[in-house]
Amino acid sequence: MDLEQKYQTGLHALKEYASTAGFTDVVIGLSGGIDSSLTAVMCVEAFGADHVHGFMLPGPYSTDHSLKDARDLADNLGIETQVISILEPYEGFERALHKVMGGDLEGLACENTQARCRMVCLMALSNRFNWMLVNTGNKSEAMMGFSTLYGDTAGAYAPLGGFYKTDIFALSRWCNERAEEEGAIPPIPHHVLIKPPSAELSPGAEDEKSLGVDYATLDKILIAHYDQGKTAEEVAALGFDLEQVQSIIVRADSYAYKRAMEPPFPQNPFYV
C-alpha cells in the first residue's frame, strides 16, 4: 500500500469501529510525540475537532518542549485540550508502596507506574463522558514489548497498531505535505518530526537507546522475518548482523503475551 492507502485504512477502520461501538466522541492522550500526533490528526478527520478531546498528562520527567509540541498540535487541529498532572497520583502510589518496596519507585516500577497513572486518568474520562479512548501504539513497539501493560497498551482501538514506526514518520510527513498542498496549516509541528522519540519516563531517555537499535534497522528486520517469512540467516544476508537479528527475534517472540493484550487495530480485526 502507498502512504495514502495506509492512512485511509487506519482512518476508515477507526470510524467504523467507533460507530459500531456506539461512540461519537474520542479521548486521546497528547504526549507531544509523533504517535499521538498522527493519531490525533486521524481522529479529527474521522470525528471532527469538536468530538476529539485531548489531554496532556505531564509527569516527573516530561519536558517543556513536549508540552509545547502537544499544544501546538492541538492548536493546529483546533481540538479541546486540558492538562492533568500525574505527579500527585504517582507520588501517592510511591508513598503507599514505599515500605514494601524498600524505598522510592525505581527502574521499570517507576516508569510503568507513570504510564498506568496516565491511563487511569484517561479511562476515568472515558467512563465519565462516554468517550472512546483511542490507543496511540505502533507495531514496532508492540513487537518489541516496548510498552506498559495496563498503561499505554490500553484503549478501545489502535488505528496505528498495524504500522511500524518508520510508517508513522512517513505518514506524518505525508499528512503535513497534504495539508500544504491544500493550502492548510501542516498539523504536526516540525519539531515532532525531527526530535528523537522518547516516552519521557526517566531522565534523558530515548526510545532507540532503550531498544538498542534504531527504528529503521529494527523495522527492516521485523518486516523481513515476520512479514516476509525469512529466517534469521536470510535476514542477516540482507546486510544485518546475525547476532542482532537473532536477539530481536528472540525478544519479539518472548513478548507475544504482551501483544495479546493490545487493543484491536485495522490489520487485526478480531472483533469482526
Where in this protein do the model-derived segments appear?
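ATP/NTP-dependent adenylation/nucleotidyl-transfer catalytic domains that generate, transfer
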Residues: 1-31, 36-272
